[in-house]
Amino acid sequence: MMARKSAPPSKAGAFGEDSDHMSRDDAAEGFGQFERFLQEWSRRDFLKRAGGAAAYLAFMAGGAELLAAACGPSTAPTSLTPVKGGKLIEGMISDIANFAVLNAGDTSSQQVITLTFDGLLGIAANGDNIPLLASALPTVSSDSLTFTFKLRPNLKFSDGHALTAEDVVFTYGLMFLPETSDFVSRYRSDLEGYIQSVTAPDPQTVVFKFSKVQASFLDSHCRRGILPKHILGNVTPKALNTHDFWSNPTVVNGVFKFVKWDKGQQVVFARNDNYWAGPSNLDQYIYKVVTDAVVLAQQLKTGEIDVGQPDASQFDNLKTVTTIDALTFARPSFVYYLYNLDKARTSSYAMFSDKNVRKALHMALDRPTMAKAVYFAYATPADSVQVPMDWAYNPNVSPKYKYDKAGAQKLLDDAGWAKGADGIRVKNGQRFSFEINTNSGNKVRENLIQVMQQQWKEIGVEAQPRPIAFQTLVTQLRTTHTFQVILLGISSGDTDPDQTSLWTTKGIGAGGLNGMQYVNPEVDRLMAEALTTTDRAKRKPLYFKIQDILADELPGPILFYPSYLWGINKRVKNFNVGPYNEYQGRAWMKDVFVTDGK
């Protein structure tokens, strides 16, 4: 999955008139909404926790969208004849990290990768597999150990070079072959030990043979972008890790070609005339970096950008703008915070290694109140690592945690963390004090860690909020492991519930997403066993057990299931984004057009 953006997600994974520079009319309207908000869910409770001024600031920065109604997952179908030409500008609150097709772990990078590199299959808005480079879904043997794909005829890369089965063999070889182990791929832990061979009997046929069943292969791993062997085939696996292709992909096969990347500002793409499905309607697509989601909403209003995901505090207002479609829908995503459980990080390990301490911290968070104060009904408190739209979701996961300040304090007392003279708990001479990071520019998450700081302080725990650049956050999680606590989101473009890279020891190594260094042999065993069959009736109980274990252990407590919020200029048509195809399935961008052709 993809550590989201939130989180996006994520996962995980940003203006004139923002929360710091608003007009008097906007401020008055916001305060009126805030007053109604207080009346709705307990003025006394919120003021007690945050104080009047802080409550108002949190409201303005975090969610004036309480009264907004839910909409469908895409723009209304249009009978207009597509207009050729023009450009579309999409605003995003963080820059991309790279075009590392087989290793990108952030949603920003995944989004541009799927614009430039198609896989054998794609994913529809509802999660269904759809053929892209493959002419149809694969033929699968009765024992689920052999997958045979037929490629579409006359496939080409953007430079006109033929795309054949050999390119598929080359790409997948980087993810499982022993001789390519020096190449870092986040998917190696999912495929190594399962794939026996990938062969090309002829230029149009690819055969995957497995030594044992890998149940998530079809729904999770057939969408990997296919790389050009004629460009990268002579590069050693180790050298490939730092090859400039990942920042300057000169040859692609997706709907758009890469033009340039102005870091911190924009990524520019042009129509790929050699695209297998025909050239896109748009001449140009621009990924614009707008590092503040409030500013992003303002740029939607002014037309500086055409589409984007606005800050929650601006969403209700966007619904009143006649030039914008404001859309919201459920997403396969959760927002969570995770601890650094690496024993080598002695300070963090001393605080967080005891699961009862982790339980205490989670019980101290008033999540229903937080959901209303920050998300305003566009998120629901979460209890499971699986999302409700997943077939493996356990609605009766156990244990579940209610807000219990007294219970949290007792757990900390029992664990030997006693309050010091300044009210902060101490054990063996160490103060219970740590830094919590999230991605800067995401106002909802910045507000969340502020509220978490306040509520943890009430039980004698000192948290120091520190928002940092998203790509720095990703580096801390996946590479340096220098964090103490991180809050972020996980967004998945996959419909398979496998989370091996997130919670098992396989995900601790290079390229994995288990940056918390969580180790539980039973989770490892159950996750592996769940991949040994494609029978959902057999897999489901195993995932239920995993959810119970992670709910009890809380290495990365799940806070919320957020909704997608989108603003789309009405000049944009066929922008058919949905729950599953936002980051990992952008082939539909071929049919997007702008009515003025500009």
Question: Model regions: which residues?
Answer:
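Gly/Pro-rich hinge or "lid" segments in bacterial periplasmic/extracellular proteins
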Residues: A125-D128, C222-S280, Q284, V294, ...
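N-terminal secretory signal peptides
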Residues: M1-D45, M60, E65-A69
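N-terminal lobe/hinge region of extracytoplasmic solute-binding protein
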Residues: G91-S142, G173, V251-N253
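Aromatic- and charge-enriched surface segment that lines or borders ligand/interaction sites
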Residues: A136-D182, V207, L296-Q299, M351-S353
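Detector for C-terminal structural segments
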Residues: A14-G16, A27, G51-G52, L57-L66, ...
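Ligand-site clamp/hinge motif
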Residues: D244-S247, N272-L318, P332, Q450-Q453, ...
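Surface-exposed binding/hinge segments that line
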Residues: K150, R186-V235
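Alpha-helical secondary-structure segments
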Residues: I89, T164-T171, P203-K209, G254-V255, ...
